[in-house]
Amino acid sequence: MKFDPMAPETLADPGAAYSELRAKCPFHLYEGPDFKFAITSDYREIKEEILQDSPVWSFRFGNAAKDTISDVGFKTDPPFHMAFRAALTPGFAPRQLAKYEADITRICDELIDTMRALPDARGDFHELFALPLPSRIMCVMLGAPEADNLHYKHWADILQDMLFHDPKPGSFEPILKEIYPHFNGHLDARAAKLAEAGISEPDNSVLGGVLPDDFMSRAVIARVEGRPLTREEQLNVCLAFLTGGQETTISLLANLMWRLLEAPERWERLKREPALVENAIEESLRFDPPVLAHFRTSLCPTTMHGVDLPERAKLMFSIIGANRDPAIFEDPESFRMDRPLGEARKHLSFGSGVHFCMGAPIARLEAKIAFAKLIEALPNLRLDGPTERIGSWMHWGRVKLPVAWG
C-alpha cells in the first residue's frame, strides 16, 4: 500500500493512519524526497526485538530519519548507556520526586490563579497551563531560573524542528553556539564552587550544601566507568532536559484535556470519579502518544519480514501504531478513560527496555497533580473554539486549545 507519514491525511489523524498501515502492511518501506526508511507498527516486534538490547538496532546515530548529534551521553548503546543512566538515576529517586511534588503543586496553583483572574474566563489552555507547567518544572529540575523557561522552550523547538525536518551536516552549529555557552556558564559556576570548597572528588554529599541539588550539579559530580563526565557529556544532560523535559509533557497535558473536553461527558465523569485521573493519564498516553514514532539505525546488514536491509539503514517504529495493536489492547481505537491500568500501561509512549524514559515518573506526577487540581478549581472547563495540532510530523499534541471556564 502507499503510505506517507508526512501526508496531510496522516498528520490529521495519525492513529487511524498507522492502525491501517499495521493492519495492511505491518512492515513498510517508505521512500520520500528527503528520507528513506522502513516502518514497523507491530507491538511485540517493537518491544521485544527493537527496544531491548538489540545487537542490530542502534540509538547512537540519533533518533531521526538521518544521522544527527549523538553517540554521547544518553544517546549511546549499552553497556555504556546503562552506566551513564545509572550515574544520573538517583536524581529520579522517590525522595527527589517528593521534593518536586511541592514545586509542581506550587506552579499549578499559580497557573490556575492566573486563569481564574482573567476577566472573560477564557483563554488558550496550551499557553496558560500545558506549556508553562512542564517548562518551569524542567528549569527547577535542571537548576535554572524558572523565568528562563520560555527561552529554553524556544531553543528546544528549534532543535526539534531541525532534528525531524531533514537535518544537514553542520546545521545544528549556529543554535548550539547559543545554547552551549549558556549552559557552560552554569556548569562552570558549579565547578568553581567545588574548587572554592577545596573538593576535588565530589560525591552526592555536596548536593544541597556546597552545590544546589539539581541535575546540572549532578552532571558536574557524576562519575561513569570510574571517571567524571566530560564537558560534552555534561552538556548532553542539559540538552536531554531541554528537548525531552518539555514538549512531551506539554502534549500529554494538552492531549488529555482535549479528549476530556471534546466529549464533555468524560470531563463530567472525571469530576464525579477523580480516582480515574491516573487511568485517564495512561489512556491518553496510549491513545495520543506525544511522540508518534522513534528511529534506530542498523549496525549490520539484516533482514526483516523477508526484506534485506543494509548496514546504516533507518527503521522507524510507530509508537501510535503499537499502542493501538488489537493483539495487545481491547477495543484499541476507542479512548476509554476507565481502561484498566494494567492494560493501559502496556503502552510504549515512554519506550521500553534500556532506553525507557527516565523522566516518566515526573511526567506522570505533573499530570496527576494538574488534573486533580483542575477538576476541582475549574469545574466548568469546556472547549471554546477549534484546536490546532503541533506542526511536527513526528509529534502529536495541541498547540492551540481554546477553553472557557466561566
Positions of PLM-derived features:
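Cytochrome P450
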Residues: M1-G406
